[in-house]
């Protein structure tokens, strides 16, 4: 059986190894063919791992790295300094063929800069894009870019659309519907970059371009891949996560107001828990860096154990599907 090997920046994120270690152990329990490499400070990692004496250490190894890239450090600092940072070392393991994917909850800008520097982009790709799954009425859609590219040309949006479509196909969506996020669905709507990107996508053979989509259409499941620049995508993603948390909290509060509400709440609790699970950010945690010659998945910095597990699952799936190679094989036929 194929055994994905994933290198983990164990020191990144708000909780560092205190989240990464238990999430890694839980991931290995549900994925018996996978192997993990925890990159970070050995003394701390070994102390946390020692609390799990039954753990199969053949499948979970520690790789030493003495430095950590802080959340407030600039990408340029990450590139020039800290050669022994856990994030950098984890990416070097992918570059050198010791691992097939890297997962980090650390500094997003630093992770993107180091990924581009160490792994390089696929031929024909100017900029990698961040993509993740977003829940919809019909399941989920793939949204990109999520913040890696704040300012985008029409050509960049076109490349994102092509990469998103190929990735969606590789992850099980046949002939994915691709749409550009816009302020309206009419052809006259949108800024110049979006209009030019639409013109390019209309001419692309082998791409199922569905035109423009508005924010509400995204959640109705009117497209399988939704493309926008990183400025819009990041705001949309954060607003969606905040809205989901607010709705969940409001519903819980209403069911605690009075005896009758509590009785109704008790009956509705299983359904509400299922609904919360369907839209929980932790379930969809893990944004992939598309367009690189290797697999990199960014976990939310504030993700807890369940969320980090989701990021590991996404990385393992992309390894099994050989995503960079599949992208490379299709991109040369679709890129301008």
Curated annotation (Swiss-Prot):
It catalyses: a fatty acyl-[ACP] + phosphate = an acyl phosphate + holo-[ACP]. Its main location: cytoplasm. GO terms for molecular function: phosphate:acyl-[acyl carrier protein] acyltransferase activity. It is found in: Cytoplasm. GO terms for biological process: fatty acid biosynthetic process; phospholipid biosynthetic process. One of its GO terms (cellular component) is cytoplasm. Its EC number is 2.3.1.274. The keyword Transferase applies. Keywords: Cytoplasm, Lipid biosynthesis, Lipid metabolism, Phospholipid biosynthesis, Phospholipid metabolism, Transferase. InterPro entries: FA_synthesis, Phospholipid_synth_PlsX-like. Pathway: Lipid metabolism; phospholipid metabolism. Catalyzes the reversible formation of acyl-phosphate (acyl-PO(4)) from acyl-[acyl-carrier-protein] (acyl-ACP). This enzyme utilizes acyl-ACP as fatty acyl donor, but not acyl-CoA. Homodimer. Probably interacts with PlsY. Belongs to the PlsX family. This is Phosphate acyltransferase. It comes from Pseudomonas paraeruginosa (strain DSM 24068 / PA7) (Pseudomonas aeruginosa (strain PA7)). The gene is plsX.
């Amino acid at each position: 059986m194929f055994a994905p090997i994933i290198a983990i920046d164990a020191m990144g994120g708000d909780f560092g190894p205190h989240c990464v270690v238990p999430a890694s152990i839980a991931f290995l329990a549900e994925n018996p063919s996978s192997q993990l490499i925890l990159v970070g400070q050995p003394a701390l990692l070994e102390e946390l791992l020692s609390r799990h004496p039954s753990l199969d250490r053949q499948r979970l190894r520690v790789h030493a790295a003495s430095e950590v890239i802080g959340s407030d450090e600039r990408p340029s600092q990450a590139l020039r300094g800290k050669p022994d940072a856990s994030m950098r070392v984890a990416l070097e393991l992918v570059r050198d063929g010791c691992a097939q994917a890297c997962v980090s909850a650390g500094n997003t800008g630093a992770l993107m800069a180091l990924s581009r520097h160490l792994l390089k982009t696929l031929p024909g790709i100017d900029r990698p894009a961040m993509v993740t799954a977003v829940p919809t009425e019909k399941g989920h859609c793939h949204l990109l870019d999520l913040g890696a590219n704040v300012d985008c040309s029409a050509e960049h949006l076109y490349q994102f659309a092509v990469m998103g479509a190929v990735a969606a196909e590789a992850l099980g969506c046949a002939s994915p519907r691709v749409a550009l996020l816009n302020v309206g669905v009419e052809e006259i709507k949108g800024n110049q970059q979006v209009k030019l990107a639409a013109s390019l996508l209309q001419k692309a053979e082998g791409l199922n371009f569905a035109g423009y989509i508005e924010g509400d259409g995204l959640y109705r499941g009117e497209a399988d891949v939704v493309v926008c620049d990183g400025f819009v995508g990041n705001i949309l993603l954060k607003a969606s996560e905040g809205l989901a948390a607010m709705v969940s909290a409001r519903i819980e509060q209403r069911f605690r107001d009075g005896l009758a509400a509590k009785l109704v709440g008790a009956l509705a609790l299983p359904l509400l828990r299922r609904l919360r699970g369907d839209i929980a950010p932790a379930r969809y945690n893990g944004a992939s860096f598309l367009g690189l010659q290797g697999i990199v998945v960014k976990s939310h910095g504030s993700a807890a154990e369940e969320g980090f597990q989701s990021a590991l699952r996404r990385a393992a799936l992309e390894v099994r599907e050989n995503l960079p190679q599949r992208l490379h094989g299709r991109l040369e036929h679709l890129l301008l």
